[in-house]
């Protein structure tokens, strides 16, 4: 089995450098749901490490501009924290609600940093309020009733568009089939 570990900022910069040398123009920074201030500071240091290897393109991704387009997939944070990310060049934020069913949500996340349905639902609005230009959202199909998840996902995307004046940068719908005989667990 794979062992998880935290990469140091220099390692992250090295990985970003390798990606840019291979011609990649977009990097998605993914970090675990570490709710501690230390975890957040690591995410900021990671963004700084990526920004140290190439100029960051603000705003929308384009093939006609030089530099990196930097996006983040992190736990929900307050708007002030997203402003700190935006100041580092992060211009897109992706967050999966996982399930839009408020009755099912506590079954999937009975405790820990993801336990608040409302906090997770507010994450994309907080990102927009903090200056993140592009928002991506999704639900994990197979957890709840597909029709409910679809309608709620579209409604959430529309709400964000009305709030920000911009359509969602991405809408994801992974796992379109139920995961039969796979119990919910708190750890892999």
Residue ranges with predicted function:
Residues 1, 29, 180-184:
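Short, hydrophobic beta-strand segments
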Residues 2-14, 19-143, 165-172:
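Core AdoMet radical
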Residues 14, 20, 151-155, 161-188:
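Auxiliary Fe-S-binding modules of radical SAM enzymes
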């Amino acid at each position: 089995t794979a062992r998880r570990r935290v990469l140091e900022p220099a390692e992250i910069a090295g990985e970003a450098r390798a990606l840019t040398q291979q011609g990649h123009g977009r990097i998605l920074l993914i970090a675990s749901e570490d709710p501690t201030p230390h975890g957040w500071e690591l995410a900021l240091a990671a963004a700084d490490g990526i920004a140290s290897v190439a100029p960051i393109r603000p705003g929308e991704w384009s093939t006609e501009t030089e530099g990196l387009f930097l996006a983040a997939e992190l736990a929900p944070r307050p708007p002030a924290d997203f402003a700190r990310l935006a100041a580092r060049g992060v211009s897109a934020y992706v967050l999966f609600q996982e399930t839009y069913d408020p009755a099912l949500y506590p079954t999937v996340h009975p405790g820990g940093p993801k336990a608040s349905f409302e906090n997770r639902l507010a994450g994309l609005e907080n990102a927009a309020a903090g200056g993140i230009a592009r928002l991506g959202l999704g639900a994990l199909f197979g957890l709840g009733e597909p029709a409910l998840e679809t309608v709620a996902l579209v409604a959430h995307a529309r709400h964000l568009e009305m709030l920000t004046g911009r359509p969602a940068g991405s809408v994801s719908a992974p796992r379109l089939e139920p995961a039969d005989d796979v119990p919910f667990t708190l750890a892999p």
